[in-house]
A protein has these predicted regions:
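Residue-level marker of regulatory loop/turn positions in helix-turn-helix DNA-binding domains and
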Residues: 86, 107, 139
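N-terminal helical cap/lid subdomain that shapes the substrate entry/recognition surface
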Residues: 2-91, 95-102
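Asp-based, Mg2+/Mn2+-dependent phosphohydrolase catalytic module
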Residues: 1-3, 95-98, 111-226
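Conserved phosphate-coupling serine/threonine residues in phosphotransfer and NTP-handling enzymes
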Residues: 12, 108-110
Length: 226
């Protein structure tokens, strides 16, 4: 029976959440809309279609909303994306998951044109079995559609899948999809914010250090029993 490790990207594998927030704030400011950085930062991890009305009251389908969203993408890709870094030991974690028989799939609210370079930055493009982005779902996080799309592409049952994410929106999406999730604090949220996660680690590096005791290792061991 296949097992799946479903990985979020922004804030989990790549240190990009602050950059996303600043790109949104700049785009809002250019449109004459006053939205604080802190308000936007706490919404990073939602899909852009949900973040936009959440922080500004603008409909994502409105003319202004579409303009702000498009400009945010331009700013992020030109001003921030070239300078981002992956978190330590990301490739090592994915290699360990593969060695334990997991099919590794990413589930990200990013659009494909941003997801591809982010995966290059994380250093795992060649290791992935599949991916699901906002282009593959009707509803973005915290709705479960992207996670379900990733799960379906993995071929695993819900009981054989674990997600890794950094925001409360990842936790909500995973639980709504019926799978367990491991949280990391590198996105800016702590254990209280990630309540509902089976485990919370300071980051991928700590998860790697404690991998033999993790839920990933336990599921792999249990699934290997005759």
């Amino acid at each position: 029976m296949p097992r799946a490790a479903i990985l979020d990207v922004d804030g989990t594998l790549v240190d990009s959440n602050d950059a996303h927030a600043q790109a949104w704030v700049t785009a809002f400011n250019e449109a004459g809309i006053d939205v604080s950085y802190d308000r936007v930062r706490r919404a990073i991890g939602m899909g852009g279609d949900k973040l936009l009305p959440h922080v500004s009251g603008l409909s994502a389908e409105s003319q202004v909303g579409r303009r702000v969203s498009a400009r945010r993408g331009e700013i992020f890709r030109s001003d921030f994306l070239p300078h981002l870094n992956g978190f330590p030991r990301v490739r090592e974690l994915v290699q360990q998951l593969l060695a334990d028989g997991y099919r590794v799939v990413v589930a990200s609210s990013a659009e494909s044109q941003e997801l591809d370079p982010l995966l290059e930055i994380a250093g795992i493009t060649d290791l992935l079995q599949a991916r699901a982005s906002s282009n593959d779902a009707n509803r973005s996080k915290p709705d479960p559609d992207i996670v379900v799309a990733a799960l379906n592409r993995s071929g695993a049952e819900r009981s054989q899948a674990i997600m890794l994410g950094d925001t409360p929106y990842d936790v909500e999406a995973a639980l709504a999809a019926g799978i367990e999730i491991v949280g990391v604090e590198t996105g800016g949220w702590g254990p209280d914010d990630l309540r509902g996660a089976a485990e919370v680690h300071t980051g991928v590096a700590e998860l790697c250090a404690h991998y033999p005791d993790s839920i990933f290792a336990r599921l792999a061991a249990a699934s290997s029993l005759p």
